[in-house]
Amino acid sequence: MHIVLYKPDIPQNTAAIIRLGACLNLSIHLIEPCSFNLNDSRFKRVVMDYEGMCEIIRHNNFEIFLKKYHKSRIVLMTTKGKKIYHRFKFRKNDMLLFGRESAGVPKELHKILKNKIKIPMNKKTRSLNVAMSVAIVVSEALRPVSYTHLTLPTSVPV
């Protein structure tokens, strides 16, 4: 399973998502441009030493990403999605695409992507924090495969 972040704005969110990716053995794709440098102190403070434990793939733009992964199923997480995330049939190699914190993804991407899902929310609110959204959706997406690609460290009591 892959997490794809479209032009992320907030270094702390991206760092938290990379930590999640490291812990759950997920690849993280960053669609450039990011609004910050990966050497940013705010990013480094949150990512700690997890950055080296996670495959991070950077793409100069969405067109380059799409050209490389055009045969993959891309699932857009959006407040405009019609299907609720826990009713969606995730697959092992899905590319879970999350928009930028400030603006989501452009309308053009909404038009070309078929699979659009959402997290139900209070109608008085606009959106969840992107790192929280990633954690919620990824936990559900991995459930059908029973997290079989992970093992508990021997030092953790069961």
Describe the function of each predicted region:
Residues F98-V137, A141:
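Flexible, gly/pro- and Lys/Arg-enriched active-site loops
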Residues V156-V158:
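Acidic, Ala/Val/Gly-enriched low-complexity intrinsically disordered segments
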Residues M1-T79, L142:
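RNA substrate-binding interface of SAM-dependent RNA methyltransferases
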Residues M77-A103:
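Mid-chain, well-packed structural core segment of small domains
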Residues I17-I18, R42, R87-F90, E108-K111:
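Short amphipathic alpha-helical segments
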Residues R45-E51, K92-D94, I136:
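Short, hinge-like loop/turn segments at secondary-structure boundaries
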Residues T148-T154:
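Conserved small/polar residues in nucleotide/adenosyl-binding loops
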